[in-house]
Amino acid sequence: MPNLVFVTGNANKLREVRQLLGGAALPYPLVNEPLDLDEVQAASLDAIALHKCRSAAARLPPGTPVFVEDTALCFDALGGLPGAYIKWYVQAMPLCDIASMLDAFPAKTARAVTTVAYCDAAGAFHTFSGTTTGRIVPPRGPTDFGWDAIFEPAGEDKTYAEMDKDKKNAISHRGKAFAAFREHLCSPSQRPPPPATA
């Protein structure tokens, strides 16, 4: 039986995805592979994720189910920027500077979006998306997981970073995308065929 490969070298992301998928009776064992994939520059998160998934599938043995995840943080006042480029912003500048990009705007609203792109064992590609609306705030809580400390979901008084993991996973963009992915993985069409009998 093949493994279900999650392309990531990010230990925090792997831990969170294991939590999000862990309660399901997955058809394959989950492993990670830190492949270095080219990222296409595109406005569409689906296009970026599908490009990465196709690249990953081409580098793995045929029939290996593989998925990638891509996330965007879209500031409404900036027309959706930084969007899919948020991870480069996080690497290049402190979170307080990212939050201050909205200082000149009255609206601090934003959307957090995740797309999971999956290539199943038959070679078919699928995407699953989740969105959470909220607002950008000065950093609050631990700053060791991306931009969680500056995103406060709508209707909440805590940033993702201040929430316990179960609460965050229940309402987050990533949680929503992986709930749809988990449902697909557990569908009868995704079950591996039984071993051939002699």
Curated annotation (Swiss-Prot):
Its cofactor is Mg(2+); Mn(2+). It catalyses: ITP + H2O = IMP + diphosphate + H(+); dITP + H2O = dIMP + diphosphate + H(+); XTP + H2O = XMP + diphosphate + H(+). It is found in: Cytoplasm; Nucleus. Mg(2+) binds at residue 39. Its main location: cytoplasm. Binds 1 divalent metal cation per subunit; can use either Mg(2+) or Mn(2+). It comes from the Eukaryota. GO terms for molecular function: dATP diphosphatase activity; dCTP diphosphatase activity; dGTP diphosphatase activity; dITP diphosphatase activity; dTTP diphosphatase activity; dUTP diphosphatase activity; GTP diphosphatase activity; ITP diphosphatase activity. It is an enzyme of class 3 (hydrolase). Pfam families: Ham1p_like. GO terms for biological process: nucleoside triphosphate catabolic process; nucleotide metabolic process; purine deoxyribonucleoside triphosphate catabolic process; pyrimidine deoxyribonucleoside triphosphate catabolic process. InterPro entries: ITPase, ITPase-like_fam, RdgB/HAM1. ITP binds at residues 8-13, 52, 70-71, 87, 145-148, 168, 173-174. Keywords: Cytoplasm, Hydrolase, Magnesium, Manganese, Metal-binding, Nucleotide metabolism, Nucleotide-binding, Nucleus. Its EC number is 3.6.1.66. GO terms for cellular component: cytoplasm; nucleus. Belongs to the HAM1 NTPase family. Pyrophosphatase that hydrolyzes non-canonical purine nucleotides such as inosine triphosphate (ITP), deoxyinosine triphosphate (dITP) or xanthosine 5'-triphosphate (XTP) to their respective monophosphate derivatives. The enzyme does not distinguish between the deoxy- and ribose forms. Probably excludes non-canonical purines from RNA and DNA precursor pools, thus preventing their incorporation into RNA and DNA and avoiding chromosomal lesions. Homodimer. PANTHER family: INOSINE TRIPHOSPHATE PYROPHOSPHATASE, INOSINE TRIPHOSPHATE PYROPHOSPHATASE/HAM1 PROTEIN. This is Inosine triphosphate pyrophosphatase. It comes from Eremothecium gossypii (strain ATCC 10895 / CBS 109.51 / FGSC 9923 / NRRL Y-1056). The lineage of its organism: Eukaryota, Fungi, Dikarya, Ascomycota, Saccharomycotina. The gene is HAM1.
